[in-house]
């Protein structure tokens, strides 16, 4: 391709928007990422993710959730769901417009680079599969695709 020309990327289904959303949490203790794929980014999907974390992944013990100020994090339904686990959960609200303070935001950047950047996929399912593969590699201690977080704070 000559300099100044724009590459044309074919679209399989022009004019149709397809979305999948990832909810994720980084566990400082075991250096792993817990995640769930959702069709919608809303209070109900986030509550399902909280239940996955607190019931399936960490049924006992206490956890700290660092959360930003996205609207569904502070919805009445989410706050009510969190109140059911108030004896085990400490919510740490991050200041507005400070994604650099949230470790999972660093991981999302890493994930996008490995799973999506400069890659043409044939379907949304292929994009999700690519993302899930990179996510699974984060939880494999021997994988070279892992993003390591410094714990020398």
Regions found by a protein language model. Give the residues of each.
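RNase H-like polynucleotidyl transferase catalytic core
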Residues: 6-15, 83-103, 119
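Acidic/histidine-rich, metal-coordinating catalytic segments
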Residues: 61-74, 102
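Extended, low-complexity cationic-aromatic segments
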Residues: 1-51, 147, 152
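Short, aromatic/basic amphipathic alpha-helical patches
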Residues: 75-85
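Mobile genetic element proteins and their domesticated derivatives, centered on retroelements
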Residues: 24-25, 31, 50, 68, ...
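Short, basic/hydrophobic alpha-helical segments
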Residues: 45-64
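Structural signal for conserved beta-strand scaffold positions within catalytic alpha/beta enzyme cores
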Residues: 35-37, 93, 115
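C-terminal anion-handling pockets and recognition modules
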Residues: 90, 104-153
